[in-house]
């Protein structure tokens, strides 16, 4: 295959490019900075300089591919709505504009966040129902743009991904360790809510399977672990893997939301980032359940990595890298 990937320096995009190159596919990846360019070169793929938020010659380069995987996004629990829309919506529009009258397979990486945080069971066919957070709204709007392009003839699939973690993960372990160092870990609610996570290798396997099969325009897939443990179990796995102890303190969701609201007010006044956001609280207390039944049937896909083993491998990776190369705790990534 010839594949063009946006977000080639991001967590998912970079892992995908590496896997594609190992399999011998021709890959070009969009890189918006010299650092991103260097990361793409490390994978043995061809970097294409450009930014999805700015139309340019990279749009013609995207047509090189038999498959285009749109992995670039701004992912964060905090930030101006205009910035989420600039990257996630306008960026998607730019890549779609470049692919008009192109006859390849477009794979749009979306998120289970398009459903917001309303408790319930969701399937691949459940419509987006965002929760007024700019990240959720922007991902839902990006899906709408893809659906419009499909009506105009684009061959496109959409992939809703759960919370991703694994070696190379920019946030998961770093943020967790911040709490451990304080001696206390706060969890929203009783901790019996599903963790809704998926290991990076399982995501990449799913994306490869989608890329290799004939496109069913408009088909949505969900990549999530169907038997992921609850949040409290996740915390216990991580503490065990780190060989650390910390007091686990459940906090009622209404209290957590109130604290986060105050943090956000202070941050707006101080023009700084809050240590806790309402989005993070709702995500941690999320009681949504996601079915992957259709995805499994169509792709023959199922997660190979248990969450317990996945957490252990992530911790092992984190311990091996030097402190200077460890990721920051700021959960924002525009790749």
Each predicted region: which residue ranges?
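NAD(P)H-binding glycine-rich loop region in Rossmannoid oxidoreductase-like domains
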Residues: 39, 45-90, 98
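Catalytic helix-loop patch of NAD(P)-dependent Rossmann-fold dehydrogenases
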Residues: 86, 119-164, 185-188
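Conserved Rossmann-fold NAD(P)-dependent oxidoreductase catalytic core, especially the SDR/UDP-sugar
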Residues: 90-134, 157
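Glycine/proline-rich active-site loop of Rossmann-fold NAD(P)-dependent oxidoreductases
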Residues: 140, 154, 165-175, 209-221, ...
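Amphipathic terminal alpha-helices
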Residues: 290-297, 302-335
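N-terminal Rossmann NAD(P)H-binding glycine-rich loop of SDR-like oxidoreductase domains
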Residues: 3-23
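NAD(P)-dependent short-chain dehydrogenase/reductase
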Residues: 149-195, 200-202, 209, 238-239
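Mid/C-terminal beta-alpha module of Rossmann-like enzyme folds, strongest
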Residues: 213-275, 308, 312-315, 325-328
